[in-house]
Every structure is written in C-alpha cells, then in structure tokens.
C-alpha cells in the first residue's frame, strides 16, 4: 500500500485515515434487516425491515422514523459497513444501484471525487478547487500499481503509460460525460501528468533539445500551455458549464522507444461556429472576446480600435458578458504567455488579435433598405472602415462585395442586389468562416511547434470532446455533438461488453454470453445511415428550392412511426422554443429545432468577398482563405501547401465532413488500448458538495457504469500469456517448475497456480492465455513483491553478516593484541622491582658489543639497498602515474563508448523484446504443434481403423449414387414436363392479354372482358403458384439429394485433405521443431551473450562511477602509505639499532659483571647455568627479533609487489579494480595490524631497555635477584608462547565450527524463509478472517504471533530433515537410474520383438477404444452438464459456508491455543532433535561421499559396457558377412522398393496435380454456380419488380380508360345540352340579343384558349423544360379567363337592370360557360396526364429493353462458361481415364509385390534358420528389417488405396460436372423463357399503350367534332342576328312614315 505521507495535504482528499475507516467499518449492523428502499427525494434511503413479506409486501422503517410498506421486489440488499467508502465498487458484495449511489455519495461528501468502477474510473465534479493535483501527488503516483494507490486520474494515466511501455502498444484515454462534468479539467491534468512523468530524470542537456524557439519553452511546457491557448479561442460559458469546450480534440502525446516524451499533435472536431455571432440568454461567446476587451493590455485596445465595454459590440453581448470566479484580464495574460511558450511570433499574435477585433467590428456593421427599392445600403461606414483596416482590405471593396455580390449565371458574372436580411446573413457567414479557419490555423500552428522531429514509437491519445447536451434550444450543432457521444458510448459498450466476451469465446473459456442491452446501433443508424437524418439533410441541400418544411416532411415520411428512436415532439407549454422532432439518445430524449439547418450544413459564403480576403495585406487572413475551393467548401486550410481542387470539394457539407472526421477518430481509437474515465455531473446548479441522486443515477445507467461493474465481477478482466506469466511469477514457487526438465508454459502455469494458496475458482485457462478475476492479479503481485522483498532481505542479511563477521574478526584480533600487551605489562610490573631483573636491565645492553659494528655495517648496507629499492619504487610510482594517465584516457574512451551504447540501447531493448516475443510465439507454436502431432497420431490410428469401413461404405455409396442418378433423371423429366406446362400457360396468358386488349374498345365489353381476364388471370396464377410449389418441392428434393451427395464428397475430400495435411504437417512439424530448437538455442545464446554484455557494461559503468573517480585518490593514498611504511621502516630500523646497541651494552655489562663475579670467586655453578640460560634466551630473542625484521621486510616487499601487480592489473582490466581494492584493503589492514604489533613490541623493548639501563646502573648489587627474576621471566615467556599456540589452534577450531554453524544457519534460514512465506500466507488469510470477526482481531493477531514463532522453528527443523532426505533419495535414485539403465540396455533388444507384436494387437484395441472414447466423451459432456448444474447449486450455498466460516474461526482459535501449548512442550524436544539432525547430517555427508564414489564406479562400468558393446558390434559385422548370400535377396528387394518408391512419387505427383486441377475446377464450378444463382436471383427480382410495375400500369391504364370514358359521356351529355340550349336560344332569339353578343365574344375567347391549349400540348411533347413554362402560361391564361369571366358577370349584372325578363336565361348561359371552362380544364389535365404516362412508359420500355439486352448478354456469358466447363469436364474425364490406367498398373504392381513378399518371406525363413547359428542378435536385426519392409508394404497399400479413392473421387467429380452442366443448360433455358415472357409482356404493354393513344385520339376527334358543331351554331346565330337586325331596320323604316303621317 502507498504511504499516505507522500501525498502531504492531499491525503485526506484521496483516502481516509485508519481511525476514520475503523469508525465507519465497525458500525453495528444487522445484515438481514437493513435494506435500501426507493425514496422520492434521495432516490434510495436506508431502512430496517419490521415485518416479513406477506402478499409480496414488506413493512419497513426508515432512519427518520417513517414506516412504509413497499413491495419486496423494490427493496435492494444493503452491504455491510466494511464495504463503505470502497475505492473499487466492483468489490461490493451486493452490487445494485442503491449501493453504488450510496458509495459515491459517501465519498463525495468527504471530497473523494475519484472512484474505480471495475475497469474504469468514475469522477464527480466537485465545483471547487481541491489540492489533489500538486507535484507531490504526481511523484507519489509515478510507477504505482492501481491496487496500491487511491483512485485518481493520475493512476489511470500512469497505468496507460506503463501499459504502453510494457505491451508496446498505443493507448488512449476516453474522458467522456455530459457537459459540465469536468472532462476538460481532467484532460489538462492527464496532459500535465504525462509531461511531468515522461520527462523525469532528464538533465539540463536533454531538456535543451526540446526548445521550440528562442523565446519558447521545453516540450513539456509547450504541451501543457497548448490548453490555455486553445481554451481561449474554443471555450465558452454555457448554462451548465462556465468553461465548456465548444469543440472536440484528440491529443496524441508521442513517446520514444524508452518512454521519453518525443512530440505531440492535436486533432480538433466541430467547432461551434454559431457562437461566434449568437449566444443564448445566460451564455457567453468565446473567452478571447472578453479577454481582449478586459483592458489588461491597453496596447491591444489602441491597436484594435476597441473600447472596454462588451455591450458596444453586437457579436459578444447577446448573452452575459462576465463569468463568476473568472478574471478575463488574468486569462488574457495566461493566453499571451501560452502563445509565447508555444513559439508564436509577435506578428502572428498581433494578426490573431487583429482578426478577432475585426470580427467584433464586423458585427457592428449596419445596413438599411433604400427607399422604394428592395436593395440594401450601408447605414454608416465607421465599423466597416475599422474592420477593413484590421483585415488589411479596402473598405469600399468590402462593402461593395457585401451589397452587390457578383453571381455566376452560365458563363457570365452578373452583379446582384442584396436585401438587408441577405447582407446580414452574409456578414454572419463570413465572420463564422473566418473564426473557424483562424481556430484551425491555431491548432495547426500548435502542432507545428509540438512536432520536434524526435524518434517516436508509441503514443497515448487523450480524447476530450463536447459532452452530451440537452438544452432548451437544440440545433444542428447539438445533433452532431450528441451523435459523436452516441458513437463513443457504443465503442465503450463494444469494448467493455461485446469484445470482452468474444475474447472469452476465442480462448475457450467456459463462459455464457451475457447481453447487457446497451446496443445503440438503431440510434446511430437513424442519424448516419442512408435515408437517415444526415442523409436526408444532405439530399435537401442539393435541391435549390428545399426548405426547412420540406426537410421536416421528409423526416416524418421516412422515420415517423418506423424508427423507435424518432419521435414527434410532445406538446410542452414550458418549452420556450419550437421543437420539430425528438431523438431517443442513450442519455435521454432530446428535442431538436431544424430552423436554419440547411444553411448551416451548406455553410455558403459570399464569393465576392472571399477573393478580397485572399488579397489581404494581413498575411494571416490571406493564408486562411488561400485554399478556398468553393462556396460550400469545408476543407481546412493548409498553410504553405497548394492542394489540387477536388471536383466534389464544393459539394462537401458540414455533416459529411463531420462524419469523415468521426470515422477517422473511431478508427484511431480502435487501433489503441482504451482507458475510460466517466465524468459525472452531481447537480445542475454547480453547487459544491451537493449531489442530485436521480441525476447521478441517470448518468450511471446511461454510461454503463453498473453494467461495467457487473461484467468486471463476472468476467476475467486480467489476462496474461502463459510464457509471460511463467516468467514473471515463477519466483512465487520455483520448485513447482523444475529446471532440469522441459515443461510446457501452460502446464507450468497450471502447476504454479495449483501450488499457490489462492482461490482456484478465480482464474481459468484459455488456449494461449490465463484469465484472472478482478483483484487476483493484484494478490499475485503482492505475493511477488513479498517474495522479492524476502529474497533481497536475505541477500542483504548475508552481505551484512559477512561484513559483521569481518568486523568481528578484526575486533577479536584487537582484543588478543590488547590481552598480550596487558599480559606483558603486568608481567613487567611484576618483575621490574626484582633485583636480578634490574641487574639484567643494566647488563643486557653491555652484551655482545663487539658485534654492534658488524651489525651497523650490515644495517648501512641494508640502508643502501633500501635506498635503491626506494628509487625503484619511485620509478614504479612514475610508471603508475603514466598508467593512471592511460587509464584516465581509457576511461574517457569508455565514456564515449558508453554514450554510444546508450544511444543503441533503445534498439537493443527493442530487439530483445522482439526476440522474447518471438520466443514466446515459438514456444506456443511448438506446444501447438506437439498437441497437433498427438492429435494427428490419434487421427491416423482412427483412419487406419476406419479404412476398411470406408471401403465398404464406398460400395454402398456407389449403389446409392446410381439410385440417385435414376431419381435425378426422373426428376429432370418431370421438371421438363413442368416447364413445358409453364410455357403453355405463358402462351395462354399472352393470348388472354390480347383478348383483353381487343375487348377494351367498347365500354361494356371492356368491363366484362376485364373481369373475365382478371378471373382467368387469378386462376392461371393459382395454377402457376401450384406448379411453382411443385417445382420448389422437387427442387428441394434435388437439393437434399445434392446436399447428401455433397456431404459424402466433402467427407471423402476432407479425409484425403486431412491425410495430406497430416503428412505435410508432420514434416513441417519435424522441420519446425528442429528449426525452433536451433532458433531457441541461438536465441538463448544471444540472450546470454546480451545479458553478459549488459552485465559487463553495467559493471563497467558501476566500476567507473565507483572507482574511476577514486582512482587517482587511491593511488596517491597507496603512495602516501608506502612512504609512511618506508618512514616507519626507517624509524623501526633506527629503533632496532638503538635496541641492539643497548642490548650489546647490556651484554657487555653483564659480561663484565660475570667476569667480576668470577674474579671474586663467588660464582656458583647454578649462577653459571643461569647465565647460560640467559644467554640462550637472549639469543632466542635476538633471532626472533631478526625474524620479525625479515618478516616485516618480506611484508613490505610483498606490499610493493602487490602494489605493482594491482597497478598492472588496473591498467589491463578496469572491471577487477573493485576486487583488487578490497584485497589490498584487507592486506593493508593485516599489515597495519602487524606493523602495530611490531611497533608495540618495539616500544615495549625500548621501555624495557630504558628501565633495564636504569636498573642496571642503580641496582648492580642485586644481580642474584635479577637472575632469579630472569629465570621466572623465561618460564613465563615459555608459558605465553605455548598459550599463544594453544589459542591459535583453538581459534582455528572455532573458525571451522563457525563456518559449520554459518552453513547450518544458512540452511535453517532457507527453511525459515519458506516457513515465513507460508506463515505470511496464513497471516493474510487470518487478516481477512479478522475483518469478518472484528471483535477477535487483537486476540487472533497475538495467537498468530506465537504460532509464527513455533511454526518457524518447526519448519526450520523439518525443512533441514527434508532437505537431507531429499539429497539422499536423489543420490539413491541416480544410482538406481544408472543401474536400471544399463540393465535395461542389455535386455532392450529382446523386448523390442515382443513390443512389435504387441503393437499390432494394440492398433485394433485402439480403434475399439476410439469408439469407446467417443461414447465416453459424450458421457463426460453429460457429466459436465450435471456438474455445472451442481456448481450453480453450490453457488447458492456459499452464504451458508460464509456463516460456517465464522464458527470455523472459533474452532481455529481454540485449536491454535492448544497448538501453542503443544509447541511450547515440543520446543525443547525440537532442540534435541536439531542436534541429532546435525549429527545425522554429518553422517549423511559421509554417505553422500560414498555414493559419489559409487557413481564414479558406475561410470567406469559404463565405459566397460561401451567397450563390450563395441566388441559385440564387431561380432555383428562378422555375422553380417556370413549371411551375405541372404543379403543379396534383401538388396534386390531394396532395389525393387526404390523402384516402387520412384513410381510412387511419380504417382503421388500426378495425383497431386490432378487434385490441384480438380480443386481448381471445383472452385470454377462453385464460382459459376454462385454467379448463376446471383443472376437467377437478380432476374427473379427484376421479374417481380416488373410484374408489379406492369400490374400498376395495367391498373393505371384501366383507371385512365375509365376516366376517359366518363369524360366522353360527360362530353356527350354536354353536346346534347348544347343542342338543347341552341334550340332554346333560337326560340328566344329576340329576348337575348345583347346576351348573344356577349356569349359570342366568350365563345371566341374560349376557342382561342382551346387553340392555345393545343399549341401547349404540342410544345409539351417537345421537352420537359418548355412544359414548365407553358404550364406557367396556362396558369396565366386561366387567370385571364377568370378575370374575363368576372367582367362578363359584371356586364350581365348591368344588363339585369335593363333586361329583367332575361334574368333566368342569363344565369343559364353563365352556368353553361363555367361548365365549358371546367370541361376544357379537365380535358387539358387528362391530356397532360396521358402524355406523362406515355413518357414514363417509354422510359420503362427503354429500361426493359436494356435489361433484356443485359439478360441476353449474361445468358451468352453463361453459355460460354458452360462450354468451358464442358471442355474442362472432358479434360478431367481424360485425366480420370489416365488415373484408372495408373490404378490398374498399381494393382498389377501390388500383386507383383505381394508375390515378391511371399518369396522374400520364404527366403527370410531360410535366412532365419541359417542365422540362428549366427546368434540371436542377427535374428533380431533381420526381424527388424522384415518389420520395416512390412511397414513399407502397408504404406504402399495405403497409398494404393488412396489412389483408388482419388480415382473414384475424380469419377464422381466428372459426374457432378456433367450434372452441373446439364443444370446450367436448364437454367439458361429457363432464363431464355423468362426473357421471352418479358418481351411478350412488353409487347402487350406497347399494344395497350397504342390503344390508349388511339382512344385518346378518338376522344380528341370527338372533341373537335363538337367544336365544329359549336362553330356552326355560332355562325347560324350570327346569321340569325344579322337577319334580326335587318328585320329591325325594316320595321323602323316601316314605322317611320307612319309616325310622320
């Protein structure tokens, strides 16, 4: 676990302390009564069950004392308190919505915003700053496993980073969630983490290479600062988020081969352009507007001509202008700083700001409408002048382009006037396009900076895209955003649910597929598929007159009521904006408004202004529009690159571009390993610490959090390759996988996991991987860490022990030296006052004074030698200095080499990884091949058993095939008869159609014939359907027979193919095994070599780092030490000279005293003896002193030699410096100790000399006492020497015992570590149990401690005994193995004969066992089924087991107490047993030595056996010579065998060629069949479509005929009515004179209108375009007629006053006129409809003709293919004949071989009888050859049988091809019949069409005839009028005279 102190002040926000967790986990709890119940406010509340369920309902009491009655199904179980505040919700006991919500609520209340949820991380927006993103937190999470550290976004990022390095695979992090959930903040934290972690350890020199510009920062800083720059231009305030990303981005952070940061790039998606010019209330525009207007940089206001009030500018003041807790001025400084870090130049920054400022002025441009015109003009030019100035264009040109754009009409350009609305729209479109292009340029410029050109190998992509949005007004942008989130959610579902479970199936895991019901494909299809929302939108954008209403109508027509995800808007009075449709997304139902969607999708621009921008003096603006391709182009600008204009670029819409970018994004994501972070919105008010339970639950359901936890719990989220698992976790139990034998990786994994004390139901084995439940891999990692810690601890203990033992030895030496000094001082103090000693001290220097000169001369000579040696040492020192210089140079060279090696290290690591992967793959392939080899061997055995059965079945199948052929012939005849009937019926149908056409000339006859034809047609269709059913039934039977035949063919083909495959696979397997073995050896050697090289390099690096720096210092220290030793040596020599001089003086004085005593005569014999002894002692001391001097000189010389040797070795090899240094230090310490001892002895002697001189001069009279004390001193010295020798021997013995004890301790420590490991496992289990038994925790821990101590002792003792026993048994086993091996070799050859005989019997038995095995397999499957059922029942019993586990804990506790008492009693016994075991170990050691001796004797015996074997081989060769006569026949047989093998190989080659040709023909035939079936299906489909079209046409024609007939009847009635009116008008001629004149004018106008209509009909036939214009003219003429009718009505109204008598007649005439107009309009519409139908029929006729031609072409191609198939079949028949001849030849050869075999068997029997005299071994050899020949004969027979099978297969294939050819011919005939039928139908339709035209012309003639009659009536009326006028004139003339009279 992580040390929380590393996190500092952030610890409390990530993980609670131990005390706090104990308070939460130890709350009293009743698991049976505590539940969750639904609540209206908090979604779920805690409650206690009061009464049990009655009638499905339960009474509960909540925490606030409310009593509720709820249904039992509404309750959800509650987890124990120990599961509160869980960091991973997948670990919950009861996984439900209430538990997840409660856990998130508890953690959020403590500001722990991150929580794991299975395989992904959930984060809740805190709406406040938390100190969890500091540098200390980043450092703490680096390199931590997920199970160690608390949940955090850094943990997910670090996991992705480590997965990238470990798996060598690209990673991605998908940070998703609704808008305002905190995605952008988490994205910034992830990028910050990667930038810091990937750059840790870089020195200043390395960071210098990441500088982008002179003023820019490092790559890490640039990546981090890219966010503020993009947020300023792409983020804005929305209703739910103050810093909402209004664009999507996918940031790829690239890393080098070693994980170092290399570069980065950014892809942006769908910037919300509408926000540039429009904001909803409560929202704000992009941040950069308000940053510029903040006034933080006054120079910007001056440069951009802007004020500081946002409300002065229309584009940014439609919503709010400020955001709480956001300082726009500080944000401007941060943005400017970020652009500096990113390397933006001053000109580039100014250009960006100028464009933004120009857009603000752009929005203030005002326009007004000219008086009396619809054209707009500028209402002031101040804003336009400012915008033009900032954009670097002319203000006049800009206004002219906006007000009078040039439009292309044909090949010319026309200046067009614009209305105010059009100008305002064009200004907004230009502003949006300019801002969008500026943003994309900004992203590309940032990518240019982040591209460092460093080598990059992997990347981690971070996706931050706009979250799901449900606003009050949802437009086109929201649809695109929500569609993107829908795709991402489906990707998450596929990765989490579908792909995960498919992986289980591929690996063979026992898994039942779980459908979690989150398929979002219907919604995605609704949006993106053809005829989807976007498709319809793009289609509408193609039509010029399309509108929002037409778009909405098409949406309703295609999806309303048809798609469950498309709904019509529900009425809602609260809704402020109108919604046109609703879409059911995964996050909810979203209403959309389609206002302006067509314009947004087309995104048109004013193409007159764009060239002005392209010529702008602002280079950035000109660059933005440099690659503009058309008015609808949405291609992003690419600065500096001239791209070719694509033809379709101008037609690409926003939706198309968005779909392309989204598909690219999904492709990138699918190529990575994703890591998901789900962001949650806690509440909609942005209040910190408040959680809306219903809102959170909705997001949890939609985001798949609950389903993710469930599948994580039920599935296996962790998996490893077997080789990787073996390599990584073998350390957990090395003994489970022996080193001396090969063990497959899977078997090794099974053994390793089986040997561990873990839950074995938590993992499963797949084909190539081992799968783990959630949490188990973390447990294994903890066990591995513990094991490594123990190993390292043991290694450290050994090292520390060694160092302490050395220190202890040094301390012992110092103690012995102190003891010696103390003893000498005590002895000296004891004798210094003795008179004789005083005399001795005086006399000693006087002795042997004569030798002082000689010694002085020797010392001088020695001094000269030492000076020479000093000169030599000085020369050597100079050599060492030179060597040091060379070593320094070599060190520099090595540093350069090291740098080169570091440069190549990445490649070496990559090659190593590739080699390891290839090794793993090869091992898996070897395993697979070995398994396949075993399977193939079993299959071979089965095939051998089934061979005879198949031969019998072949004969039966031949009979069946003959029967089937007869049946097929019958079916073919029936089929031919059926086709003839169908053809006859078709002809009859054609005749009936002709009859129907003839009967249509008259009305009554037409109706009757039509009804009869319909009845006959229905009957014929019934008959045809019956015949079709019979045909289908027959075809089904034929298909069944073909299927059965095909199955037999496939079975045989599979058998043959399997055999060939087995033979080839066997060879390939053998070759692959050998190649794999060689490759493996080579790889192992390379790996060893690389490992050794790497270790040498590491050693060199370490040695250079540790020794190279100290080299000069060490040499100087050695030189100084040598000089010190020289000085000490000189001082010691001088001291020794003084001592010798004093000794000589003492000796002289002693001699003088002795002479005086002799002269005095007082000397006794005892005194003389004492003097002799003293002289002898003095001589001994002198010799010891000389020996010490010589030893010291030798030591000094050795020191010099070692120093010289060490310097030489240092110059030769740098790697041995450390060992030499240690050795020198050891020797130096020993020398120092010796020098110290000598110095101490010299000082002792000097003090003794001085005291002796003093005593000799002072106490000469006490000579006798001195002699006695000298004797005592001599005795004490002898005792000291003996004691010293005894101590040395004891020291050696103690050292030996110490080494034995150390070896014993090491053995016991090994046992102790293994015991500690098992005890650690027990401790972990007890800790888990102690969590469940909280009250017993402390007691169990105390008992465990005591148990651990006793268990360690017991394990140590038992491990030592087991180790010794294992060694003994291993030695015995080796001896037995060698003995049995060589005994088995002697009898092996005799057993081979018996084994060969047994094999023949075993083959039959194996064939029987194969059948039994199949039956057993079925029974085992049934048992497995039962076992699974029992396991499912066992799962229900786990709760009872858990409860019983508590009782077991109590029992364990009592048992442990008893075990403790027993351990205490057994401790002493174990101690005694340990001593006995040690003695036994010594005995076993001797036994082991004896066994080794016996092993060597066995090896000698082996050599003897080899020599005997060689002799036996020579005897066998002699016997072989003796039976050479019989060998000739064998040679002949071998020659025949070789000949047969040659023929066999030829036949095999021919057979393979035939098989290849056959397979080729099979593929061709299958392809032809497939093409024919496709053609047939296409023709059938087209026939069905044409039948349906013909039926519709027939109905339309019928309706047209009926309508024409009705119009004719109406015309007839109108004519009769006209005649009647004509007569009436003639009768009332005098009353209607004025009315007749008006009627005449009206008739003339109607006649003119009729002529115009006829002209229009002719013009409509000319072309479709002219028809539209004529239709417009007709409408105008109709309006004119209506106006004229109104005038006529007015005139008639005037006449009403004058002509009251003609009122009724006028009305009748007006009604007649209206009826005539209606009839004319009706006739016109009917004629128009007939012409349209005619054109449509002509088009259909052309299509049918084309299709008929295509069918004919396909028929011709099919005939050619059939002919080719016939020729191929003929060729195959010839090949079959050849194969039959070959088969006959093989049969004859077989008989010949059988005869030869019989003869050879006879000869063999004779040879056997003759060879019996030669010995048993020769017989065995011949029998082996006979067996080989028999095997070869069997192989030849098998091959012959296979050849026969191939011949039969070819015969069957030829028959199949013939049959298939016949089928193809029949199909072609049927197709020809269908084509003929179609042609006949086309002809009938043509006839019907001609008849309809004829009828129309007849009606037109009738109409013309009626018109002529009307004209005649009008002429007669005119004549009558003239006559009436004449009569009136006459009457007036007649009346005039009368008046005069």
UniProtKB/Swiss-Prot annotation:
The record's GO molecular-function terms, alphabetically, read: actin filament binding; ATP binding; cytoskeletal motor activity
Q: Which residues form the Myosin N-terminal SH3-like domain?
A: 30-80
In this UniProt entry, which cysteines form S-S bonds? Answer: none
Q: Name one GO cellular component term.
A: myosin complex
Where does the source fall among the domains of life?
Eukaryota
Which parts of the sequence bind ATP? 177-184
Question: What are the entry keywords?
Answer: Actin-binding, ATP-binding, Coiled coil, Membrane, Motor protein, Muscle protein, Myosin, Nucleotide-binding, Thick filament
UniProt record, GO biological process:
regulation of CAMKK-AMPK signaling cascade; regulation of cardiac muscle cell contraction; regulation of cytosolic calcium ion concentration
Q: Which residues form the Myosin motor domain?
A: 84-785
Q: Name one Pfam family in it.
A: Myosin_tail_1
- The chain's coiled-coil residues are 846-1935
Subcellular localization, as worded in the UniProt entry: Membrane
Give the misc comment: The cardiac alpha isoform is a 'fast' ATPase myosin, while the beta isoform is a 'slow' ATPase.
Q: What family name appears in the similarity comment? A: Belongs to the TRAFAC class myosin-kinesin ATPase superfamily. Myosin family.
Subunit structure, briefly? Muscle myosin is a hexameric protein that consists of 2 heavy chain subunits (MHC), 2 alkali light chain subunits (MLC) and 2 regulatory light chain subunits (MLC-2).
Q: What name does the UniProt record give this protein?
A: Myosin-7B
Species the sequence originates in = Mus musculus (Mouse)
Report which gene this protein is encoded by: Myh7b
